[in-house]
């Protein structure tokens, strides 16, 4: 009942789900989203199929009631490209990006959304490392790498984030200009967050639980992802400072 009083009002929450060969989890994710986000009246669930070659497209075709819109790419161009396609389908309200692999639990969304609308927040970044109720043990080098790039981001942007690569960010759509985005790989989240921080007045962080996958379960990130992330942080900040981007 605590959620319903405010969630029946605008603004709108647009949940973007980039998908590539997620036949094992996509219907589970969509079903769970529809269930836990039912109190959020003003919402859109937008699926972006980034050239899946398994049965994901057929599953989506058979379950149209589980989403508001389906955007398809004929070939796989990467998550960054899929996110841009999704953002281009949204013109107002807020955006949240939900991965299709269930590392991030949709049960968290109503609580996070309540925080955003109750406090009129521009950007809410979540953290797996700040008082999270339950977090699966990380790979040591992943955690060290994440802490390193978070520290660099904080120094360059004068912030105090604890986990800049947490998968859940809720932000006002108007704060991200897709034509300004130059990164399509691992660096894109750092690029987007840099723009968000520098275009926002009210930026907050909230803890979430996290169930990270193992490499056997399909985890893809590795140490080589750090280089484009570092470059994205520095390059985007320079663009903002010198080109007023």
Please identify what each model-predicted range represents:
Residues 49-58, 102:
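A conserved acidic beta->alpha catalytic loop
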Residues 29, 56, 83, 107-109, ...:
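Acidic donor-diphosphate engagement hotspot in glycosyltransferases and nucleotidyltransferases
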Residues 34, 41-51, 71-73:
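Short beta-strand/loop segment that forms part of the nucleotide-sugar
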Residues 69, 73-89, 94, 106-186, ...:
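Acceptor/aglycone-binding surface of glycosyltransferases and processive sugar-polymer synthases
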Residues 22-25, 52, 79, 105:
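Donor nucleotide-sugar binding loop of glycosyltransferases
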Residues 22-37:
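Short, well-formed alpha-helical segments that are part of the catalytic scaffolds
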Residues 1-12, 156-159, 181-245:
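Hydrophobic helical membrane-anchoring modules
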């Amino acid at each position: 009942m605590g959620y319903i009083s405010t969630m029946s009002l605008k603004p709108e929450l647009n949940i973007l789900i980039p998908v590539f060969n997620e036949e094992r989890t996509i219907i589970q994710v969509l079903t769970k989203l529809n269930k836990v986000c039912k109190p959020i009246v003003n919402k859109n669930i937008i699926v972006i199929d980034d050239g899946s070659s398994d049965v994901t497209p057929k599953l989506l075709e058979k379950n149209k009631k589980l989403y508001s819109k389906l955007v398809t790419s004929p070939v796989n161009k990467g998550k960054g490209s899929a996110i841009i396609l999704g953002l281009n389908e949204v013109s107002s309200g807020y955006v949240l990006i939900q991965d299709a692999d269930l590392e991030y639990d949709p049960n968290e969304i109503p609580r996070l959304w309540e925080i955003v609308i109750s406090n009129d927040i521009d950007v809410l970044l979540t953290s797996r490392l700040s008082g999270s109720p339950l977090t699966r043990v990380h790979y040591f080098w992943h955690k060290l790498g994440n802490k390193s790039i978070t520290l660099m981001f904080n120094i360059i942007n004068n912030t105090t984030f604890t986990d800049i690569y947490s998968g859940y960010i809720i932000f006002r759509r108007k704060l991200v200009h897709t034509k300004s985005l130059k990164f399509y790989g691992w660096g894109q989240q750092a690029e987007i967050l840099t723009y968000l921080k520098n275009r926002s007045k009210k930026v907050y962080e909230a803890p979430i639980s996290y169930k990270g996958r193992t490499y056997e379960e399909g985890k893809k990130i590795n140490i080589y992802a750090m280089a484009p992330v570092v470059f994205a942080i520095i390059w985007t900040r320079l663009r903002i400072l010198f080109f007023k981007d």
